[in-house]
Structures are given as structure tokens and as C-alpha cells.
Swiss-Prot record:
Keyword terms, alphabetized: Mitochondrion, NAD, Oxidoreductase, Transit peptide
Catalyzed reactions per annotation: 2-methyl-3-oxopropanoate + NAD(+) + CoA + H2O = propanoyl-CoA + hydrogencarbonate + NADH + H(+); 3-oxopropanoate + NAD(+) + CoA + H2O = hydrogencarbonate + acetyl-CoA + NADH + H(+)
Gene Ontology terms describing biological process: thymine catabolic process; thymine metabolic process; valine catabolic process; valine metabolic process
Function recorded in the entry: Probable malonate and methylmalonate semialdehyde dehydrogenase involved in the catabolism of valine, thymine, and compounds catabolized by way of beta-alanine, including uracil and cytidine.
Protein name: Probable methylmalonate-semialdehyde/malonate-semialdehyde dehydrogenase [acylating], mitochondrial
Self-association state and partner proteins as the record states: Homotetramer.
Organism the protein comes from: Aedes aegypti
Length: 521
């Protein structure tokens, strides 16, 4: 049933019948093109972050269920890898159309399970959709290379081939975007894919599977399993799985990279961040303050590219009171409420950790100029809400600076020169993203050239590249050789075969008859 034909609650209920059990709200698996109930005895309750009411129960899939997903993917690879690249491209054409037409329903599910505002949830879907759109150019992206006449009568050419069964392990903060970073690139290159969405937000992935079926993707090309630590270990250890993509925390990312790597798998692992925004006194003040507030507090700060650290250079520190006032005016509420700027964080545990890191800053000497920890939201008193929070007079040895807070908290530092700002950022172990706000081109150029961070914005607070490029976080924020999506994404999901062939000119058959007098030479 096409999602586009369904509206409101009717759509939500219809979808639930597809991937959940209506009487007891339990999320299903997706194996061999079908939504399947798990036989597990272990379940994880998924709570609405705005109310903490249980939305659904997510299974910890059994060993047999995970094995069946791998077998399905292994079987499908035999035919899918031999499917015309034009046929694989057609699936992406259809999928991008279906996602675009059902963006609103996907966003509603994301807001319900993850908590972010509806506008932000639509952005979540859109940034994933852009990867699908880029996959539609696979006929160019997957081209090989040729050198004719590398020697007498000899040609060399190379072409890219799929790896086999691949897997993706997804985080909670982007329920649609991150799965769409993974399985579309993998399967368009001819692989099959097993996706493990975060047990906190599986709904968007399940809806995408329904759309993938409608797009005509054959059974087994993508399978979805659920679970926590055991599911991760299964993916890392199973010998059939050739490559693993991960986005999430430092601890999990390092663990997956090392464990899967020991088992001979390719791994790409996007991990933690501490993204700095450098504010020069010559910047456009109004635009800069608006961008700072949006990048720091949007999505309740639960973005790997959130601008969580502001570095004010010279007289720019005089702008801090104005920034505080902008942050104070942001509306905190449930994500589905119109006009909401900041929704809840994902869980009570996340809220507690955020509050503790803020308190650690205060104890270590930072000034709490805006405190959102005690905010109460009418009609949602049980929600996981933290309002915009700003700490000033922060130093680089404080825990609130050294650790990724992952909440609506901005820590502010001051320096005298752009050189000091560059040194500070380069000394931080993370390298996901950074930005500078200035109207001076020479300052911007110096910053771009000297900064050791993978993604740099100039008057752009969250410099996440579009999919014709790649997501190029570096240093402590990434482990692996090839980044997500773009040309590097295609390289990650393919292997190169190089052929050197020799065909002697003298061996050509059916040549023109020779009628000249034989000379015996």
C-alpha cells in the first residue's frame, strides 16, 4: 500500500500493521522482502522522548533470526550483483520519488520516536534523500579506467565490482539520513545490505523498507535486524559480511572498528565530535549570532556536526550577551507542536548526563549565563527536556570542553587572535567540523589552510557536504580509509579488478586475402 495514499492517523495505523503488531506494539524485522515477527524473549521498550510513554517494543533478534538475514542477503547477492547497473539505477529513481512523496509521514515518525521538531525531521529525510538522488548517477560513479596500447598489442583496464554482503549500524540522532547514507550506496553498487537501526528509533528504517519494496527492490537485497550489543557483535563477527558502516559514539565506534577489522572486514566509523565556531569581530553580527544559536541548539544539540563550542576572537566576546538573549527566546516544546525550536533529548539518561556535564563546568570555574536544566514544558512534564544552556569562561582543561555533551549546551571560550583559535582547535582530538565567521577573505583563507579538521565552513555553521562530495570528518572523529557517500562511498562498497590482455596483431583471423607475390620473407 503506497504511503502517499494514506493520511494522518490512518497512515500511521496502516504502517504499524505493516511493520508492527497492532494489538501489542512490537516492531518487526524485515527479512527476505517481508516484515517478520521476532521469536525473541528479550525486548527493548522505545519511549516517546516528549512524554516517556512507550511507543513500541523493539526485539533483540535471536541468533537464528540474524543468521537468516545473512542467508537472505547472501542468496540475493548472487542475482543482484549480476543485475544490470541500469536496473539497479531504476530502483533508485523510483525510491527517491517515493521518499519525496512520503517525506511528511517519515518526519512524523521521526518526531514521535526521536523527539526532534517536524521541520528538522523533514531535513533529516531530505539529506538522506539527496544521497539516493546521487545514487541515480551510479552509471557514471561506477565507471572504471582504461589504458589502451600499454605495450605492443596489449591493453589494461579496470572495473569496480561489489564486495558481497555489507552491514550498517545506525545511531539514534538521524533515523532516516544515516540509513540512507548506507544501504542505497551499497546496493546500487551491486552489494546486498543488512541494516541495524538504533533500537531507539527503528520506525523510519522500517518505513523506508516498505518504500523499497514498492520501488521494486528484490527480496533479500536489504534486510533489517534489531538489537543491541549482541547484534553488533554478530555483524562484526559473521564471516559472510564483508564491510561494516557505523555512525555513533566514540566508544562504540572504536570497538566496532577494531572487532570487525580483526575479522578482515572493511570498516568506516564516524564517531564523536567537538565542533568549534570561530567568531571574528569583523563578522556580520546579526547573521553570525543567528547561525550560532541554530547550530548549537537545533535538534537539541544531538547532531554530530552541532556547533557545540564557540571561540570568540578579540572584541567579538562583547557579543556573548546578545547571543544569550537569542538563545533564551528559543521555544522548547514537544517536536510536533507548531513553532517549537528545541525538542527533547532522546532519554532520561541523556538528560542526566548533559546536566552533570554542565554542573562539572560550573564546579571547575565556568560561568553559567543561561541555564536550561530545570525547564518545565506544559503538558509534557515527563519529557526529557533541556533548554538552551550557555557556559562562558570555559577553558580547554574543563570536562565540559573535553567531552562531547550531545545536548543543547554551548561552551564559550575567548582568545586574542585567530592563530590562538587555530591552535586550540588543532589541539582538540576531534576533527569532524569547524566554522569561521568573518568578512575578511584573507582571514578565512588562513583559517581554511591551517586548520586540521575534515569539514570546514566559512560563514556556514554546519558544513555537511552534499553527496557529490563525501562526509570527511577526520582525526579522532573517524576511523577507516573511505568516507561516507560520494566517490569515497562508492569506493568503500566496491573492489577493483584490473585486466591486462594481449592479442597479437598477427593472430587476427578473417583478414583481407593477400594477392601479392609471396617473397618468403
Amino acid at each position: 500500500m503506497a504511503l502517499v495514499r494514506l493520511l494522518g492517523v490512518e497512515c500511521r495505523n496502516a504502517l504499524q500493521r505493516s511493520y508492527s503488531t497492532a494489538s501489542v506494539p512490537t516492531t518487526k524485522m524485515f527479512i527476505d522482502g517481508k516484515f517478520v515477527d521476532s521469536k525473541t524473549t528479550e525486548w527493548i521498550d522505545l519511549h516517546d522522548p516528549a512524554t516517556n510513554k512507550v511507543v513500541t517494543r523493539v526485539p533483540k533478534c535471536t541468533q537464528d533470526e540474524m543468521e537468516s538475514a545473512v542467508e537472505s542477503s547472501k542468496k540475493a547477492f548472487k542475482t543482484w550483483s549480476q543485475t544490470s547497473i541500469l536496473g539497479r539505477q531504476q530502483v533508485m529513481f523510483k525510491l527517491q520519488h517515493l521518499i519525496r512523496n512520503n517525506m511528511s509521514e517519515l518526519a512524523k515518525n521521526i518526531t514521535k520516536e526521536q523527539g526532534k521538531t517536524l521541520v528538522d525531521a523533514e531535513g533529516d529525510v531530505l539529506r538522506g534523500l539527496q544521497v539516493v538522488e546521487h545514487c541515480c548517477s551510479i552509471t557514471s560513479l561506477q565507471m572504471g579506467e582504461t589504458v589502451p596500447n600499454i605495450a605492443k598489442d596489449m591493453d589494461t583496464y579496470s572495473y569496480t565490482l561489489p564486495l558481497g554482503v555489507t552491514a550498517g549500524i545506525c545511531p539514534f540522532n538521524f533515523p532516516a539520513m544515516i540509513p540512507l547514507w548506507m544501504f542505497p550506496v551499497a546496493i546500487t553498487c551491486g552489494n546486498t545490505s543488512i541494516i541495524k537501526p538504533s533500537e531507539r528509533v527503528p520506525g523510519a528504517t522500517m518505513m523506508l523498507m516498505e518504500l523499497l519494496n514498492e520501488a521494486g527492490c528484490p527480496p533479500g537485497v536489504v534486510n533489517v535486524i534489531h538489537g543491541a550489543h549482541d547484534a553488533v557483535n554478530f555483524i562484526c563477527d559473521n564471516p559472510t559480511i564483508k564491510a561494516v558502516s557505523f555512525v555513533g559514539s566514540d566508544q562504540a565506534g572504536k570497538y566496532i572498528y577494531e572487532r570487525a577489522g580483526r575479522n578482515g572486514k572493511r570498516v568506516q566509523s564516524n564517531m564523536g565530535a567537538k565542533n568549534h565556531g570561530v567568531i571574528m569581530a569583523d563578522a556580520n553580527k546579526e547573521n553570525t549570532l543567528n547561525q550560532l544559536a541554530g547550530a548549537a541548539f537545533g535538534a537539541a544539540g544531538q547532531r554530530c556536526m552541532a556547533l557545540s563550542t564557540a571561540v570568540f576572537v578579540g572584541e567579538a566576546k562583547q557579543w556573548i550577551p546578545d547571543l544569550v538573549e537569542r538563545a533564551r527566546k528559543l521555544k522548547v516544546n514537544a517536536g510536533h507542536v507548531p513553532g517549537t525550536d528545541v525538542g527533547p533529548v532522546i532519554s532520561p539518561q541523556s538528560k542526566q548526563r548533559i546536566n552533570e556535564l554542565v554542573e562539572s563546568g560550573v564546579k571547575e570555574g565556568a560561568k553559567l549565563v543561561l541555564d536550561g536544566r530545570s525547564i518545565k514544558v506544559e503538558n509534557f512534564e515527563n519529557g526529557n527536556f533541556v533548554g538552551p544552556t550557555i557556559l562562558t569562561d570555559v577553558s580547554t582543561n574543563m570536562k565540559c570542553y573535553t567531552e562531547e555533551i550531545f545536548g543543547p549546551v554551548l561552551v564559550c571560550l575567548t582568545v586574542d587572535t585567530v592563530d590562538e583559535a587555530v591552535e586550540m582547535i588543532n589541539n582538540n582530538p576531534y576533527g569532524n567540523g569547524t566554522a569561521i565567521f568573518t568578512t575578511n577573505g584573507a582571514t578565512a583563507r588562513k583559517f581554511v589552510n591551517e586548520i586540521d579538521v575534515g569539514q570546514v565552513g566559512v560563514n556556514v555553521p554546519i558544513p555537511v557536504p552534499l553527496p557529490m562530495f563525501s562526509f570527511t570528518g577526520s582525526r579522532g572523529s573517524f576511523m577507516g580509509d573511505c568516507h561516507f557517500y560520494g566517490k569515497q562511498g562508492v569506493k568503500f562498497y566496491t573492489q577493483t579488478k584490473t585486466v591486462t590482455q594481449l592479442w597479437r596483431e598477427g593472430d587476427v583471423s578473417h583478414t583481407k586475402a593477400a594477392v601479392a607475390m609471396p617473397t618468403m620473407k
